[in-house]
Amino acid sequence: VEDRIRRTAAWAALGGVAAYGAGRARLPAAARFTGNLVAAGVALAAASALGVDRAGLGLAAGRHVQGIRWGGMAGGTVAAAVAGLATIGPTRPYFADERISAHSNRRAAVEASLRIPLETAAAEELLFRGAVLGLATDRLGDVAGVAVSSVLFGLWHVPPALDALGASGVADVAGGGPVGRWGAVTGTVAATSVAGVVFAELRRRSGSVVAPALVHGALNVTGFAAARRAGTG
């Protein structure tokens, strides 16, 4: 009976994380910062309660050095690629974002040094490449685990993608009207789902969630800097 209660509570907690993910775009920035980190912690605890060990969560202490090595090498490559794309005429408009270009220097520094590395990269990797990938792999196997965690990662980006419509350059490039806007959202989901597969492979090869977290952070921070540069000239 106790085991059944524990498992029911764990699944209910994961349902709460999903509900938070669906509504988080409407929350104030400070609430999202705390909420993402709490959601990651709750998901990890739930997955652990459902039988996933530390290695399955990408949290085995002996693998973090490998995670840093893999993440450092791949993160540097990704950052260089994004920086290069941001300077090319055909792709530069995709980086424009009115919200980012409107940030003060102080706000931009906080975003790049705290919010993106912790709220986005660390929290999302602990959630999706830690808890979700670990649990899905444990229940469904390696291939299905990667597929499920990556698709859910893509869907996690629907609320912020909807919130960003009209402010980012992606919607402008895709064209106006409902078709262009939903095309931009669909493209965001597809791109982040593919990124989820890459992040999952990094976690598999390194054995640590640190690797995808470093690459995720490098990708987003470089993209943020590119968006700020595109908006300020």
For the regions a language model picked out, list residue spans one by one:
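Actinobacteria-biased recognition of intrinsically disordered, low-complexity terminal regions
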Residues: 1-8, 94, 230-233
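Hydrophobic, aromatic-rich alpha-helical transmembrane segments
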Residues: 5, 29, 33, 37, ...
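Juxtamembrane helix-loop-helix connectors linking adjacent transmembrane helices
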Residues: 54-120, 133, 137-138, 171-179
